[in-house]
Amino acid sequence: MEKTQETVQRILLEPYKYLLQLPGKQVRTKLSQAFNHWLKVPEDKLQIIIEVTEMLHNASLLIDDIEDNSKLRRGFPVAHSIYGIPSVINSANYVYFLGLEKVLTLNHPDAVKLFTRQLLELHQGQGLDIYWRDNYTCPTEEEYKAMVLQKTGGLFGLAVGLMQLFSDYKEDLKPLLDTLGLFFQIRDDYANLHSKEYSENKSFCEDLTEGKFSFPTIHAIWSRPESTQVQNILRQRTENIDIKKYCVHYLENVGSFEYTRNTLKELESKAYKQIDARGGNPELVALIKHLSKMFKEENE
């Protein structure tokens, strides 16, 4: 018996829907709404843009979890541990193209161009991240930041870029978006290795098990070139809690967490200055303040 289009759609989207029902922070949606303080995009267009950004973000998480061999996402089993890798890859790719289909409904000649450019950026950043990890090549801090701007900046840039197509506000927001992109990713890196809440939601220090070069580990590796401890731990892809606790202790001792916190504080105040220079934005400031609590409270 021929399956109806609706049934097929349901089967294809099941892994994606599974991820959607997990509790998320909705940071991207809040960010778009905050930027609308300046951009004043019509509500119907804004809703489509928010939907597209969320679709792409969530689809990229499905793929991320496969590429990173993750066990948990938001404290629940990753989609591919339930549905299998082939179904999840297909589901995520399907959602990318549903996102493209939605972008077409915006009816703007530049929308697809922007979509394509930002998705290429996203994949370039992601590809570099994986390459460094799997070839045991530690990037410099500058190389890492450039990669982050492609990876996190890809979707940030898409949301705000699409919004600007429907706005009279034409000021260049890229410098601010870059600051926010770095802030979000470095905060995430810090949380993965240092925050209690994160270790309850993801397996403890998952970035170490994954072998990922993140902001604190890159600092530790370059600031102590005579020691190869961190590289060796990352190379092992270890799930051993004691080794991971030792690594966190080492990062603390060589000042990598302090360096990361200071970098985050600098990015935070840089963002406030950039926001002020554009006439202020209370919603955006409130969002950044909320996200900054994590690396301040912990250490007080």
Swiss-Prot record:
Protein name in UniProt = Geranylgeranyl pyrophosphate synthase
Positions annotated to bind isopentenyl diphosphate: 25, 28, 57, 74
Q: Which Pfam family, any one of them, does this sequence belong to?
A: polyprenyl_synt
What organism does the UniProt record list as the source? Bos taurus (Bovine)
Residues where Mg(2+) 1 binds: 64, 68
Q: What class of enzyme is it?
A: transferase
Q: Which UniProt keywords apply?
A: Acetylation, Cytoplasm, Isoprene biosynthesis, Lipid metabolism, Magnesium, Metal-binding, Transferase
Q: Which domain of life is it from?
A: Eukaryota
